[in-house]
Amino acid sequence: INSMLALRDALSSGYDEALILGTDNSVNEGSGENFFMIKDNKLITPELITVLDGITRKTIISLAKDHDIETIERKIDLNEVYECDEAFFTGTAAEVTPIIEIDKTKINNGIPGKVTKMLQNDYFNLIRGKHDKHNEWLTHLNKT
């Protein structure tokens, strides 16, 4: 219910989504998504202590590894997010959604970043069966 209330509050304040924070001002997740940021070509995401261990989250971490992008799971202070190079949400419904602004602070000059777009493209290709790796993650259905 906290997620629903946070989203309702965000929407009524003119935002598209909520960023759920811990009592220590650490970033946990969106109202229904996992949170990632890119800083110095490293993929950073909150540790699993406070967030859902999402399938899409695991997929993005694997895809980043395919590109030799280091993934760091740790506590993220909200102030760090304002200084990040890129940010995005992941989830079953969100898939890979770039974040271009948080609290009126533009991320990457208000445009999706190159790493975000690369991982988003890889993810879309993967779920459509057009990716070179991880074919074992898919169940192909026969046309009837």
Mark where each language-model region is:
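Helix-start/capping segments and mature chain N-termini
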Residues: I1-T144
